[in-house]
Swiss-Prot record:
Its EC number is 2.3.2.27, 2.7.11.-. This is U-box domain-containing protein 70. Residues 730-804 form the U-box domain. It is an enzyme of class 2 (transferase). The gene is PUB70. Pathway: Protein modification; protein ubiquitination. Pfam families: Pkinase, U-box. It catalyses: L-seryl-[protein] + ATP = O-phospho-L-seryl-[protein] + ADP + H(+); L-threonyl-[protein] + ATP = O-phospho-L-threonyl-[protein] + ADP + H(+); S-ubiquitinyl-[E2 ubiquitin-conjugating enzyme]-L-cysteine + [acceptor protein]-L-lysine = [E2 ubiquitin-conjugating enzyme]-L-cysteine + N(6)-ubiquitinyl-[acceptor protein]-L-lysine.
Length: 805
């Protein structure tokens, strides 16, 4: 006995420890852990119902309301059996009520929760429980009131639907029946009525669905069977319709409409089987339906009558039946394309309005029967016209679909041809790099090598075939990025100029462009950084203005088609070692085509792109891109070089200063004292370039170049610019052959990746050398690849410096 007491005491102590652990987990909201502790405690001490009430509280927070109710019921039953404290029982009932309230909010049934709260109050009075009871009763009243209002609304919509149905306005009637269903989805009459509307509208599948719902709600409602059988009969399912009519007979064996439906089904079955049937045949068909002989006799009589009617039917009757079937088919097709054919819907709506107007006139003028008949004939003619119009629309729709498919196919073919042409163009004009070479050069597109990022891709610095290059990786999944890739290759493959960035090659597989690397970044970097801006002397700025002007003139005079840059701004003007400027970023540039209406060249687009502060206002408003668009951007760039200020409102600032005669107040004097004459000439020229009207802007190759060239020559003749001129005469290191140490005339790439003069490397190989002149490593092969891009760059450099000399 003492051993049992010791075991019980030990179990109770262990249960208390489990309760404390569960309470601690509950306070920290570790609800699953709390449930496990309470469960073990309940097993150790079954007489303590607090384990059940505590676990119910955890389940309540976990939204496991059914488990909460189960634990509360068990706690109440065990508490009453053990005569536990009424407070514990009341607490269990209150938590049960809380769970039931949560369930009631979803199921809209507050009665179980109210009963639980009333029982809790009976066990132990609590203000909190009383308040919950009041809230539950108020919620129940709200639900009852809402149900009453919903029922009234449902009755109202059903009555309105009946009115429209009597007026043969079946579409409006179906809409009101639908609203009635939303308010009271358990009324079989509404489903039956809407099924009849669907039948008249030709929506047979929807009518069959509504009839099935009507029967499911009330299997004794005869009209549901009538609607379902009628739909099945119209759909040609005669045997199924016959079985449905037989089910309807169980509701009313003497209903004439059901008997008439049975006769029609029997006639249809007989026609489908190609002959008359006897009473024995009818009993065999209906054998599984357990019908009596009297009903079979009635059906046989109906079939005999149908046979007589069949013999009397004329060819015209058969044609009319076929026409009605065709009309139903057309109506079904119309309903399936309502959303796609709004014009057809409007036309049919007008026809329905005419129907309604004719109906009103018919009700008001009943004595004029002849007139109403004539109007009905006119209406039938209009309906026939609308059907013909509908058929025409269908044929037009099919034609448009075919044209669309042809257009898509042509676009795809053009895209393939364009890609092939682009591939040939890249192969002919530049080196084609592989994706692996690009990934290796950028260290798998490392962020540490990223030197720029734009809307269509990123720019990386890398070493490619032992040359420091700039690699622009465009987004291949972007249409804009692909367009920019094709545009830049197309433009830079056609034009060459000392002040246009050199395209060394491309990787069409990854939409990557490889340019010469210009170490000093962009002109925007210098203008935005105060330290760098001071290194950009006024002589250098004038030289940059002249270089950009000459590059634009070259593009605009390109043959056979002029080129417009379209996005000229300091960020797209790159600077080399000696601050030699080069235009870049030809992604939105365009080749201009001669207009057929006037003697101008332009490019027209519905979606102008570029940098708004530098864009031609007329290009923004009309979408027409011309060389004068670059003139406007050039004027803004000149103003920025003069003032060092941001582009926002820069034109107004300079204009105001010139009107006040205080132009020096806005000039950037941090780079030295500008010659006053140069300032006025450049400011006046820039303001003319930024005129709102294109016609008022000067021509770059005429007046602008004459002024800019004179200012440049005067600026470069100053002593401070002589040193930079000497630096510019030195050729870049990668123009020098590693073997001959002279500027290369015919550069070729060897197997080691280095570029040599063709004659020098061939002589090296012919003398028996099989190693690299640069790395002394064994060459894999002796094949040489012409470096056309480098050769073109060398020729441009030589041409430029021969002209300057």
């Amino acid at each position: 006995m003492e051993a049992e007491d010791d075991e019980r005491a030990e179990a109770e102590a262990e249960a208390r420890r489990e309760k404390e652990a569960g309470n601690a987990a509950y306070r920290k909201l570790y609800l699953e852990t709390a449930v496990r502790h309470y469960t073990r405690g309940a097993l150790l001490d079954p007489r303590d119902i607090s384990f059940l009430t505590n676990r119910a509280a955890a389940y309540l927070l976990m939204s496991k309301y059914k488990e909460c109710v189960r634990d509360c019921d068990e706690a109440v039953e065990k508490g009453r059996e053990l005569r536990a404290d009424n407070k514990l029982v009341a607490r269990a009932l209150a938590r049960k009520a809380s769970a039931l309230l949560k369930l009631a909010a979803c199921a809209a049934d507050y009665d179980p929760a109210i009963r639980a709260l009333q029982q809790s109050l009976a066990e132990h009075y609590s203000e909190e429980t009383l308040a919950k009871l009041g809230e539950a009763e108020e919620a129940r009243k709200e639900i009852e009131e809402r149900e009453r209002l919903d029922q009234e609304a449902a009755d109202h919509h059903r009555d309105r639907g009946n009115d429209f149905f009597k007026q043969k306005r079946y579409q409006e009637a179906a809409m009101h029946y639908t609203e009635a269903m939303k308010k009271n989805p358990k009324d079989p009459r509404v489903f039956s009525n809407r099924a009849q509307c669907h039948i008249y509208l030709g929506a047979l599948p929807e009518g069959l669905e509504d009839a099935d719902k009507c029967i499911a709600l009330d299997p004794t409602f005869l009209k549901g069977y009538l609607r379902k059988a009628k739909v099945q009969l119209l759909m040609g399912n005669y045997e199924i319709a016959l079985a449905t009519y037989v089910e309807g007979l169980k509701c009313d064996p003497n209903n004439l409409e059901v008997l008439d439906g049975l006769r029609r089904c029997a006639a249809c079955i007989k026609r489908a089987n190609g002959g008359d049937s006897r009473a024995e045949d009818l009993r065999e068909i209906l054998g599984d339906l357990h019908l009596n002989d009297d009903l079979c006799n009635k059906l046989q009589k109906s079939m005999d009558e149908a046979a007589v009617l069949k013999k009397e039917a004329s060819d015209e009757r058969l044609k009319r039946i076929e026409s009605e079937r065709l009309a139903r088919t057309l109506e079904d097709l119309y309903l399936s394309q309502v959303q796609q054919r709004k014009e057809t819907e409007e036309s049919l709506s007008r026809v329905q309005q005419e129907f309604e107007q004719l109906k009103i006139q018919q009700d008001e003028v009943t004595v004029e029967l002849q007139r109403v008949n004539e109007q009905n004939e006119n209406l039938l003619g209009q309906l026939s016209d609308s059907r013909e119009h509908f058929e025409w629309l269908l044929s037009e729709h099919d034609q448009l679909l075919r044209e669309r498919d042809n257009a898509v196919r042509e676009v795809e073919e053009l895209r393939q041809k364009r890609g092939q042409m682009l591939s040939v163009l890249v192969t002919a004009m530049h080196c084609e790099f592989s994706s692996s070479e690009v990934e290796s050069a950028t260290e798998n597109f490392s962020n540490s090598l990223k030197i720029g990022e734009g809307g269509f891709g990123c720019v990386y610095k890398g070493i490619l075939r032992n040359m420091t290059v700039a690699i622009k990786v465009l987004r291949p999944d972007s249409l804009q990025g692909q367009s920019q890739f094709e545009q830049e290759v197309s433009i830079l493959s056609r034009v060459r100029h000392p002040h246009l960035v050199t395209l060394l090659g491309a990787c069409s597989e990854s939409s990557t462009l490889v340019y010469e690397f210009l170490p000093n970044g962009s002109l925007e970097d210098f203008l935005m950084c105060s330290d760098k801006r001071q290194t950009l002397t006024w002589q250098a700025r004038i030289r940059i203005i002249a270089e950009i002007c000459s590059a634009l003139i070259f593009l605009h005079k390109n043959k056979p088609h002029p080129v417009v840059h379209g996005d000229l701004k300091p960020a797209n003007i790159l600077l080399g070692v000696n601050l030699v400027s080069k235009l870049s970023d030809f992604g939105i540039s365009r080749l201009l085509i001669q207009s057929s209406t006037n003697n101008t060249t332009l490019y027209r687009t519905m979606h102008p792109v570029g940098t708004p502060l530098y864009m031609d206002p007329e290009f923004l408003s009309t979408g027409e891109l011309t060389p004068q668009s670059d003139v406007y951007s050039f004027g803004i760039v000149v103003l920025r070089l003069l003032t060092g200020k941001p582009p926002v409102g820069i034109k107004n600032i300079v204009e105001d200063a010139m009107e006040k005669g205080d132009l020096n107040s806005v000039i950037d004097t941090s780079v030295g004292e500008w010659p006053h004459l140069h300032i006025e000439q450049l400011a006046y020229l820039a303001l003319r370039c930024t005129e709102l009207s294109r016609r008022c802007r000067p021509d770059l190759s005429g007046e602008v170049w004459a002024i800019v060239e004179a200012i440049r020559d005067a600026a470069l003749s100053s002593p401070s610019s002589s040193r930079s001129a000497q630096d510019q005469n030195s050729p870049p290191s990668y123009f020098i052959c590693p073997i001959s140490q002279d500027i290369m005339d015919d550069p070729h790439i060897a197997a080691d990746g280095f570029t040599y003069e063709a004659e020098a490397i061939r002589s090296w190989l012919c003398n028996g050398h099989d190693t690299s002149p640069m790395t002394n490593l064994l060459l894999e092969h002796e094949e040489l690849i012409p470096n056309r891009a480098l050769r073109s760059a060398i020729q441009e450099w030589l041409q430029q410096h021969s002209m300057s000399l």
